[in-house]
Amino acid sequence: MLSLLLREVSFLTVVAPTFDSRSRLLLIAPHPDDEALACSVILQKALRAGAAIRVVYVTDGDNNPWPQRALERKWTLSPSDRQRWGNLRRAEALAALRALDFAVSDVRFLGLPDQGLTGLLLRDCDATLTRITQAIDGWSPTEIW
């Protein structure tokens, strides 16, 4: 089975992006920490090249109860607990970007509901997509990740 899988993916090519001082990178992260976990090398490469970078977080990551329950040793989480968790995740994301020497003035938090985005799109697709589109159009990126 593994050899079959390896044969199937053998055609894949890894593309390493190149950046320069004219590059405008827009990184869209579903939650805080996704940018650091998935794209920190891309961010570092773009920063070294002098590219302009904006990071947009779609949610605050406030509705991920399992790590919060474990860390706080609290089973039932109130809305204020979740809001506090989202604020903590925002602060951690900004700290991670600062560690990469990133200008946090180029960070946007859309604050859309974590684990509620599908429902929001079903209820009010146009308004939701408008918020996301404005983050893209307002930046005029040359690359979107």
Language-model features: where?
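Active-site beta-strand->loop->alpha-helix modules in alpha/beta enzyme cores, enriched
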Residues: 1-145
